[in-house]
Structures are given as C-alpha cells and as structure tokens.
Amino acid sequence: PVLQDFSNKGTLWGFVPFVDEQQPTEIPIPITLHIGDYNMDGYPDALVILKNTSGSNQQAFLLENVPCNNASCEEARRMFKVYWELTDLNQIKDAMVATFFDIYEDGILDIVVLSKGYTKNDFAIHTLKNNFEADAYFVKVIVLSGLCSNDCPRKITPFGVNQPGPYIMYTTVDANGYLKNGSAGQLSQSAHLALQLPYNVLGLGRSANFLDHLYVGIPRPSGEKSIRKQEWTAIIPNSQLIVIPYPHNVPRSWSAKLYLTPSNIVLLTAIALIGVCVFILAIIGILHWQEKKADDREKRQEAHRFHFDAM
C-alpha cells in the first residue's frame, strides 16, 4: 500500500491529512503524488509531502519505484522506496508542494518545491537540479491540440497547445533482446494543485535501440466509434517528439516533429570520432613520410650508380 506511514530512525512520517474547515486559515491541499521518472529506468517515481506525526515539520521526499521485497506487494511486484537522506530536499522546511519539471530541457527531470516563507502569507519556490548520471535513455513526447482560434489558414499546420487526455505507448527491444513496452497519459488531472508535466518523459533504461513503434491516441467524441490513433516507427532515443493531431478525425494526416536533445553521450561520441580520425591521419602521415624518405634514398642510390657507370 502507498498511503501508509513510513518509519525512519524511530520517527514516524505520514501523509499530510486533508483538513476540511469552514474558514480555513491556509489553502487545504489534498494528498497528491506527483509522478515522474527521475532516473529514466522506465518505472514512474513520485514526489510526496510527508509530515512528522509527532511534530509539526513537513518535508518533501522522493519515492523511487523499485522491485518488491516484501509480501505486501507481491502481486504488483513493485514498491516505493523513500529516500530519507537527500540533503537538498531535507534542508527545505515546511514544504507544501513538490513536483518534477525539466528545467534545462535535457530530458532529465529536476525538482521544484513550494514551501512556506518567513511570514504566514509568504511562500518560497526552490528548484533542485537532478545530478543523476547514468547510461540511460529517454523519449520526450508532447501531444498538441491541433486547433486554431478561428478558421485554420490553408497550408499551415495548426499547433495549438498541449491537450489533456492523450495516451502514448511505445514498444522496443531492451539491451538483452527482450521486448519492452511502456505507456503514459498526458495531463490526467488538472485540479487540486496537480502540477503535472505538460509533456511525457518516458524512460528507456539502458537500451539505446530505436523505438520500433510509438503509438499516440487522443480522446474521441461521445458516440464516435472510430479510434483516433496513429503510429510512428524508428524513433531515435534521447529525442523530443511533438505530435500535431490535425485533423482530429483523420489520424493518417497527423504530423510529428522530431527534435534531438544534445547530451554528454553525443559530445563524447563526437570527441571519440574526432580522436579516431586524428589517429588515422597521424598513421597515414607517418607512413607517407617514411615512403617519401625511402623514395629519396632510392633516387640518391640511382644517381650514384649512374655516376660510377659513367666513370
């Protein structure tokens, strides 16, 4: 079970209870898990606000999605593990809301925390950079609305804004050759300070293989029977895909724009490629220089031979 109390060094931490008052002194925030794959392993992690049950302190904590190791989660085979010793998060006292956001647009989810300020009506925003470094890959997908404010002009594809409700799913092959798939929904909640990501970051783990298939579906009007779904193939890892479902009822006409996300892996690959080219050029230069010296030596020997023959 997720909604349970957690114990750490004799201290009991639990979710902040929702207080329904007639005249609340502060904004009541219901229990909310903000989901995001911070380590790009393909399993959704969570950020939560926990309160010390024996005191008044409440903090933001990271819950990592890990394999199950007890009997309470055998059927799900996964569980959330609380990270208690994250120094930067622990320094933020009286946290109210914590969520994920890709601040640097590099596909790695950072953390944004809203906490109480020095006065009663004052709040502070904290941003924490995710320094996670691993040989992991991702694909970032955002599905737009494909709408115009008025009639859409001809030969111009309308972008619109990100819409709630789309469903994204991919299939690929992992590093061991096994079939792997993953899925996510876009903007499934809008109320109660949901603060969900405006896009979907799907972790691929350590598999650098292309995505064999990526499916995108959008909600259909009530009474319509046709499925609004389109498929794209051979999607490059560490890329961002912007899907424009226009027109909505003709999935074959939907378009997608693919943007590559620069990363350290690309830089290291370029450096390695340049190094190999320089090494090959150095070998070619040395061989050419040796061959030139050998040719000069042969020419001198030929000149001496003709000179002695003339004598």
Curated annotation (Swiss-Prot):
Location(s), subcellular: Secreted; Cell membrane
Keywords for this protein: Cell membrane, Glycoprotein, Membrane, Secreted, Transmembrane, Transmembrane helix
Glycosylated sites: 52, 70, 181
Stored InterPro entries: Integrin_alpha_N, Tip
Transmembrane portions of the chain: 266-286
Membrane topology: Single-pass type I membrane protein
Family, as annotated: Belongs to the TIP family.
The protein's name in its UniProt record: T-cell immunomodulatory protein
Annotated PANTHER family: T-CELL IMMUNOMODULATORY PROTEIN, T-CELL IMMUNOMODULATORY PROTEIN HOMOLOG
Protein task: Modulator of T-cell function. Has a protective effect in graft versus host disease model.
One GO term describing the cellular component: extracellular region
UniProt superkingdom: Eukaryota
Major location (coarse): secreted
Annotated Pfam families: C2_ITFG1 (PF23122)
Subunit relationships: Interacts with RUVBL1, RUVBL2 and alpha-tubulin.
